[in-house]
């Protein structure tokens, strides 16, 4: 994840036809998939557990896993990390050091996610490989992008960390986040009438916008 990338969150895909959705993502040129893991303990929603995660990981993508759970290590230990480049947990979660140690022993990057109301913390920034700035309240797709969260990008940059932004990203605001390394796009992609064109356009804007800026 050293190069700038768009990652597609499958939170808003058709889970009743997941295999076809993943196949279409591949045909449309998607390289990175963002897996949102929820179990109702940290956010009031539920997605999928280790069994389904491992089936998804059999597909040929670069995966990052966003753990919106209170006890991430319980799930992480059941995941096939050979196919995972990055795991992100939330700032509010306990035992971040234990999670970081477990991941790094397996050559997986350790990320910290910051909710819209969560401030940048010096100790956390120094411990993380990657910081995911949430531009919506975590737990549900389709929310409006909170532009005030962009101020955190420069704060995190001072620590020399890779920065991602997650939530409400569409063509109308992608140009505002070109200072990030990773943009997580979900509902904007899946609700598009022409998904392949949407992906091409939003990727071009994200990459070319950073070149001109």
UniProtKB/Swiss-Prot annotation:
Belongs to the ribulose-phosphate 3-epimerase family. NCBIfam families: PRK05581.1-4. This is Ribulose-phosphate 3-epimerase. Its cofactor is Co(2+); Fe(2+); Mn(2+); Zn(2+). Gene3D superfamilies: Aldolase class I. A divalent metal cation binds at residues 34, 36, 66, 166. CDD domains: RPE. It is an enzyme of class 5 (isomerase). The active site is at residues 36, 166. The gene is RPE1. Catalyzes the reversible epimerization of D-ribulose 5-phosphate to D-xylulose 5-phosphate. It catalyses: D-ribulose 5-phosphate = D-xylulose 5-phosphate. One of its GO terms (biological process) is carbohydrate metabolic process. Disulfide bonds: none annotated. Pathway: Carbohydrate degradation; pentose phosphate pathway; D-xylulose 5-phosphate from D-ribulose 5-phosphate (non-oxidative stage): step 1/1.
